[in-house]
Each structure stands twice: as structure tokens, then as C-alpha cells.
Amino acid sequence: MAQTNSFFMLISSLMFLSLSQGQESQTELPNPRISCPEGTNAYRSYCYYFNEDPETWVDADLYCQNMNSGNLVSVLTQAEGAFVASLIKESSTDDSNVWIGLHDPKKNRRWHWSSGSLVSYKSWDTGSPSSANAGYCASLTSCSGFKKWKDESCEKKFSFVCKFKN
């Protein structure tokens, strides 16, 4: 009888131990807080930088590539678009357009993000992109609160937003 009780206690202890260890491994660890360089802003796992110095689309993207290997911002969701719009508005800029990383490199109306991200979310302004317009680079427009995209000539000079991993 003593062996049966000892065996029962041993099995019970092992079951309790395995249950408590299972609970420990299922506990979610908090996401580490992203740290971005001074003068930039964090959103999710990226850092963002708004530059008010006007550049052509190509020069703006090169600037972003030289800044922590980033690109002009790719706006992949509505929530990210709202974040970028708030970042621009907080700067109190007078600019009517701000470059983003969307462009049509082959001029065939097939738009791509300079970062290589897939274009799944779209936020074109009414009438954009327009085949009547010779614009193959996209900007955010102030008249939409910087939430809508418009195709523009890549040679125009606008301020811009960079996006990069730190």
C-alpha cells in the first residue's frame, strides 16, 4: 500500500510540474520597444524621418538609402498612413506635397514601392493615378491631410518621409 501511495504522489508531482512549466512557456513576452535615432519617430518596428528640404523623388530616395539603409516611406496600411500623416502635420510644414516611395519605374502604370514591399493597400486621391498626367512618382497631398496619394513628375522637388529599420 505504501508503494501505491508513493507512486501516486510521484505521478501527481510530475503532472503538477509539467502543467506549471507549460504555463510558463505560454506566457507572452512583451514586445521590445524599438529605439530610433534622435530626430526620428518610431511606429511598430520601423523608424520614420520627415525631411523638409525639397528634393526630386530620386534624390529623396537616395537620401533615405544613405540614412540607415532606408527608403522613401512605403505606406502599407491605413493605420501606417494615419501615422505618417500625423508626423507631417506635427512639423507644421507649409508644403502641399510630400514624396513617398511609390513609383512607376517602367512608366506602364504598374506601381511599386522603392523598398520592394508589395502594393496591397492603396490610397489614391480622386483622379489619381491619371494617364493624362506624366507623373510616375507618388506624393501625399496636403488637401487630403497627407492621407491620399497623387502621381507627380519625379523631377518636382518636395519634402519627403524616410522609413528604416534601426
UniProtKB/Swiss-Prot annotation:
Disulfide bonds join 36-47, 64-162, 137-154. Residues 34-164 form the C-type lectin domain. GO terms for biological process: antimicrobial humoral immune response mediated by antimicrobial peptide; positive regulation of cell population proliferation; response to peptide hormone. Glycans are attached at residue 27. Its main location: secreted. GO terms for cellular component: extracellular exosome; extracellular space. All O-linked glycans consist of Gal-GlcNAc-Gal-GalNAc tetrasaccharide core and get elongated (microheterogeneity). PROSITE patterns: C_TYPE_LECTIN_1, C_TYPE_LECTIN_2. Residues 1-22 form the signal peptide. GO terms for molecular function: oligosaccharide binding; peptidoglycan binding; signaling receptor activity. Keywords: Disulfide bond, Glycoprotein, Lectin, Secreted, Signal. It holds the Pfam family Lectin_C. It is found in: Secreted. Might act as an inhibitor of spontaneous calcium carbonate precipitation. May be associated with neuronal sprouting in brain, and with brain and pancreas regeneration. PANTHER family: MANNOSE, PHOSPHOLIPASE, LECTIN RECEPTOR RELATED (PTHR22803). This is Lithostathine-1-beta. The lineage of its organism: Eukaryota, Metazoa, Chordata, Craniata, Vertebrata.
